[in-house]
Swiss-Prot record:
Protein name (Swiss-Prot/TrEMBL): Depolymerase 1, capsule K47-specific
Compartments it resides in: Virion
Record Gene3D superfamilies: Single-stranded right-handed beta-helix, Pectin lyase-like (2.160.20.10)
Biological processes annotated in GO: adhesion receptor-mediated virion attachment to host cell; symbiont entry into host cell via disruption of host cell envelope; symbiont entry into host cell via disruption of host cell glycocalyx
Biological role stated in the UniProt entry: Functions as a receptor binding protein (RBP) and probably mediates the attachment to the host capsular exopolysaccharides. Displays a depolymerase activity that specifically degrades some K47-type polysaccharides of Klebsiella pneumoniae capsule, which allows the phage to reach the host cell membrane and bind the entry receptor.
Keywords, sorted A to Z: Degradation of host capsule during virus entry, Degradation of host cell envelope components during virus entry, Host-virus interaction, Viral attachment to host adhesion receptor, Viral attachment to host cell, Viral tail protein, Virion, Virus entry into host cell
Taxonomic lineage from the root: Viruses, Duplodnaviria, Heunggongvirae, Uroviricota, Caudoviricetes
Complex formation: Interacts (via N-terminus) with depolymerase 2 (via N-terminus); this interaction probably gives rise to a branched tailspike.
pH sensitivity of activity: Optimum pH is 5-8.
Amino acid sequence: MDQDIKTVIQYPVGATEFDIPFDYLSRKFVRVSLVTDENRRLLSNITEYRYVSKTRVKLLVETDGFDRVEIRRLTSASERVVDFSDGSVLRAADLNVSQIQSAHIAEEARDAALMAMPQDDAGNLDARNRRIVRLAPGVEGTDAINKNQLDTTLGDAGGILSDMKDLEGEIHDYIEKFADDTALVRGVAWVYNLGSADGGETVITINKSTRTYAVPYIEVNGSRQEVGYHYSFDLETQQITLATPLKAGDFVMVMTTESQLPVETLLASSVGASSIGTATGETVEERLTRLYGHFVHPETYGAVGDGITDDRVALQRSLDVAYENALNGTGPSTVRWSGDYMVSLNPNSLGVSGELAAGRSALCIRPGVSIEGKGTVRLDPSFTGSQSGAVITNWAGPVDDCSIKDIRIYGGKDVATGTGITGILILDSQRVVISDVKVLNSTAGGIYLRKGATEGLYGCSFSKVSGCTVDNAGYIGIQMERPYDNTVIGNTINRCEDNGIDVFGNVNDATVTGIAQSTLITGNNIRDVLNGVFIESCGNTNITGNYIADFRSSGVIYNRINSAANDNSLTSNVLIGASGASAGVSFKNSVGYCTVASNRIQNSDYGIRCVGGGITGLNILPNTMKNIAKTLLFVEARNNGLVKSRMSTQFYEGAQVGGIPSNTSPRGVPHRFPSRLSYIVDIQPFWATEQGTREDNFERAKGTLASITGWGSKCALYDTIVAGDTVVSLNSSSVAVGEYLEINAEVYKVTSVSATYAVVRKWTGSDYTAGDYAAVIISNPSYIIRRVQWGEQ
């Protein structure tokens, strides 16, 4: 290869590893190919070659059929690698990455030109012993001709020779002009002495207002004069010395130039970016000034952004500078992270009681600072221990009006030695915005807005988490502690070992509702978690329009630790459990005053589950349920399990088989927590798509006891058919052992049946007792048969 070529190198095949002799900004700008004179094959990174180091690649494929390996740099001219910071000075000695990208593009363009058909040392175009293919026949006298045209006209050798001589002269003129004119930026033509020479002049002084750096050529009366042959130019004196004196009246035009710097040198200079135009009409300098001035870049402070080097100090410096700018109004307060940054835990990070252990956090965001830029922050996975910390947090105090947007945070969950590090943890701040952030593989939580200070009621206020992704978290996906007017909207949460979204507001007072105000959780997609949304000892939350699937316990759960979880709303959500899931919605430990409406609940043991007792004030409006294994509304077997509540008719997709799913847990069972549902509880039967209105409270059948002639036209006998027991006129085809009969508001248990009668014993306050009940079971009374489960669940 020509040694002037800097961005392309070819090696003979035979080895497997090859050096990359040039620098590059990104691996995607490097092309590795197998080549011959007639063929070329571009290789794919990872599958056909890989990087041994930053400056060396290794082939993973055979080279049969090829004789050379080519490594070429091809930098994107449209994909900007980085931006510039406000007020930066562009010098060759300290070019930033973006300037280098511009220089790379220009360098590759020059190499492409040289490789296409460069000049040799004599100024001739050099095809380098390669054919020029697909050349059209020449038309004009100065056109090149192809072999067919030459063969056709070869008979007229004299004419051909003459044409070739003319062509040679024209090409020589062009090459000479191209070789001599090294300027990139030309000035306008300058006319000597108002267009008329005095005569006899051999020296002309250029008296332009701007300095001339070169004179590529001059014309005397239209005849081109070549530098070095017809004249010379002295840069210091600005004088042209002519080989032949001028004649009186000669018209002399001098072509001047503002710069004689090579392209590479010019682009590397402090004015290089101002010499490159863009499609919008701006120069690169103008464009970068307009964009770069809006951001603080960690690269300005030494960040490498290769995903390997520890860039924590540079990233923290960018945050601190942005904070200083926000305080003083002296520059941008937005930090742009666009690289791939490795960060270690900061051993000097401060602890916050109950939230952060000292030395367990990496970066401290500051008030009024925004982070954005599609960059990646990777936590160095070599950390140990399990104390709580965070990749990005605010150990120095509240960070009102901060934002974090459009970055990725990798926590190293699957490779880290230690645990306990949350992706983002913001404490005690107002107007916090976290949007379009991806927190992946966290060893603890994903995104937390919590309360750390001992004073004040609330944690973070007037804040929003939107459009974020939390995947593979070691604990909770998104958590808020004591929120005030916070919104969690449009997030994707997947694979959390605990809750998808968690709202915590407990206070040590059992007489009050926990602390939370105006919390909206909407439009989130939550999957593969323990519980989809967990409302812990607080109220005033609105959970609506979320898609929660593959939860292992409950889709949504309301729980009390000390203070209550009251005054909540749960509407229009899709709640689909994983295999073995407990309930679509759970209420636990004296919580309530919640409206549950228009939700789709599917694939769980229970549709709605109430445990712990004292669940109060549930307003369960119509919901759609499907594949409920046991009960639509389960209430734990204890008195006052559910009080002052109602359930409207639920819509069930499917059929009830053998009383399953039941509408509710048993109600009014005299021997088993008769006040399980108490203090005005209204329950409506559910409606099934396959059967219409279904049985309620395990009511399997009802009817009227028939009189039997052989029994003296009675419907019940005592101590006649079965000694010491009462029998009624039901038989084994209508009732089963263990079922219950309600007759005249009394409850009887069926203890045996035959083809003609059923033996019943009455609940007498402590047990089902044998006795004479025929005297009260008269006049063909109505009866209700309730299933065995009614008395057992």
